């Protein structure tokens, strides 16, 4: 069977080695005679898995001891509301930096829950010579008392990534759903990090929360118990039955990432993949990208064909060539190639080859 390369933005492809291991032990995990999906989440065997998963993630991301690591339900959208309910209380205020579709969605959820009086926002994307560019504000010049400032360093729909470190007088809450573990970051700069698992961690249904201990002392609102960070900490992420199979696969992904050299190693590969694809786009008038070079996403490369009437043919022929899920988000159209950690370099080489051949054929 010819290789199939899945460029889906999420749920995304998982490392082949992880999928094969899961396949091999699907019916008999860890010598238990049953699947990991079938054992109790409170069994000593599964507890050992969860402890190892947390230890591996802490090692990979260099998470300080004063941070809690939570494995929760709800994905990124679930965390949009959890952040508000856990930190704002009845009269707290927050600032949302808007750089694309996902930060806009987080803002909308915060406004719905807390109201405009408690939520401020700043649009941080401008047009530079017709291209989208991020301009980070000097937050120290803002005279306000915020419980936190929220931002999304990588916008999957818009193909925008913020590489500069955000400097803030208030705790930083970051949606790292699409960029977690793709490059090294300093966790100690953040009050809270959250990430839906379905891009760089595992299957959908699980979200990772990394929260600094002092954040848990902020006033909270009455909310669903399963989204209460304090309860999650108190019960080791097991206040209720967690998504055990997703947790298991996340643990396997962490182990895989460690085996190939960790985040520093995969970051070099990710940079190489993105540079290769952007070079193909830039060297060919048949394709175009709408983001300044300094803010082009390494995880989600968006591009358009010069002749949009060829979009359907491009996708059809790409599918035949084993290059799937390249259609851009319905909001922006065009194409999108998601290059998460599990995407091998060979997949990008195959995509670039196809794009060059398609351009030569239809130019």
From Swiss-Prot:
Binding site for L-glutamate: 42
Keywords of the record: Amino-acid biosynthesis, Aminotransferase, Cytoplasm, Pyridoxal phosphate, Pyridoxine biosynthesis, Serine biosynthesis, Transferase
Pfam families linked: Aminotran_5 (PF00266)
EC category name: transferase
Subcellular compartments: Cytoplasm
GO biological process: L-serine biosynthetic process; pyridoxine biosynthetic process
Cofactor requirement: pyridoxal 5'-phosphate
Pathway: Amino-acid biosynthesis; L-serine biosynthesis; L-serine from 3-phospho-D-glycerate: step 2/3; Cofactor biosynthesis; pyridoxine 5'-phosphate biosynthesis; pyridoxine 5'-phosphate from D-erythrose 4-phosphate: step 3/5
E.C. code: 2.6.1.52
Modified sites of kind N6-(pyridoxal phosphate)lysine: 199
Record-listed pyridoxal 5'-phosphate binding positions: 76-77, 102, 156, 175, 198, 240-241
Catalytic activity: O-phospho-L-serine + 2-oxoglutarate = 3-phosphooxypyruvate + L-glutamate; 4-(phosphooxy)-L-threonine + 2-oxoglutarate = (R)-3-hydroxy-2-oxo-4-phosphooxybutanoate + L-glutamate
Sample GO molecular function, one term: pyridoxal phosphate binding
Chief location of this protein within or outside the cell: cytoplasm
Family that this chain belongs to: Belongs to the class-V pyridoxal-phosphate-dependent aminotransferase family. SerC subfamily.
Subunit comment: Homodimer.
Protein role: Catalyzes the reversible conversion of 3-phosphohydroxypyruvate to phosphoserine and of 3-hydroxy-2-oxo-4-phosphonooxybutanoate to phosphohydroxythreonine.
NCBIfam families xref list: PRK05355.1 (NF003764), serC_1 (TIGR01364)
Protein name: Phosphoserine aminotransferase
Organism from which the protein derives: Shewanella putrefaciens (strain CN-32 / ATCC BAA-453)
Gene behind the chain: serC
């Amino acid at each position: 069977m010819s290789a199939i390369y899945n460029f889906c933005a999420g749920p995304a492809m998982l490392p082949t080695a992880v999928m094969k291991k899961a396949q091999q032990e699907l019916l008999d995990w860890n010598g238990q005679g049953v699947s990991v999906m079938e054992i109790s989440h409170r069994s000593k065997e599964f507890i050992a898995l969860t402890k190892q998963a947390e230890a591996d993630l802490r090692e990979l991301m260099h998470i300080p001891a004063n941070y809690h690591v939570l494995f929760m339900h709800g994905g990124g959208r679930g965390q949009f509301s959890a952040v508000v309910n856990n930190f704002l209380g009845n009269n707290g205020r927050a600032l949302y930096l808007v750089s694309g579709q996902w930060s806009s969605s987080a803002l909308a959820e915060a406004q719905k829950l807390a109201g405009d009086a408690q939520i401020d926002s700043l649009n941080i994307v401008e047009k530079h010579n017709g291209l989208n560019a991020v301009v980070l504000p000097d937050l120290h010049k803002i005279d306000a008392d915020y419980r936190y400032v929220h931002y999304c360093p990588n916008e999957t729909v818009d193909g925008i990534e913020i590489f500069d470190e955000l400097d803030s007088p208030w705790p930083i809450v970051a949606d790292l759903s699409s960029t977690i573990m793709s490059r090294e970051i300093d966790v100690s700069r953040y009050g809270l990090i959250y990430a839906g698992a379905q891009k760089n961690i595992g299957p959908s249904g699980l979200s990772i929360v990394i929260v600094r201990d002092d954040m848990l002392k902020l006033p909270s609102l009455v909310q669903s118990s399963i989204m209460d960070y304090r309860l999650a900490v108190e019960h080791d992420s097991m206040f209720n039955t967690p998504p055990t199979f997703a947790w298991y696969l996340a643990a396997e992904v962490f182990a895989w990432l460690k085996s190939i050299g960790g985040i520093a190693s995969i970051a070099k590969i990710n940079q190489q993949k993105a540079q290769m694809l952007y070079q193909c786009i830039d060297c060919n008038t048949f394709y175009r990208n709408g983001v300044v070079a300094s803010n082009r996403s390494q995880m989600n490369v968006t591009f358009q064909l010069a002749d949009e009437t060829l979009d359907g043919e491009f996708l059809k022929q790409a599918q035949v060539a084993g290059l799937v899920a390249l259609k851009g988000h319905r909001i922006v159209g065009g194409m999108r190639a998601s290059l998460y950690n599990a995407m091998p370099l060979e997949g990008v080489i195959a995509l670039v080859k196809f794009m060059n051949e398609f351009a030569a054929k239809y130019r």
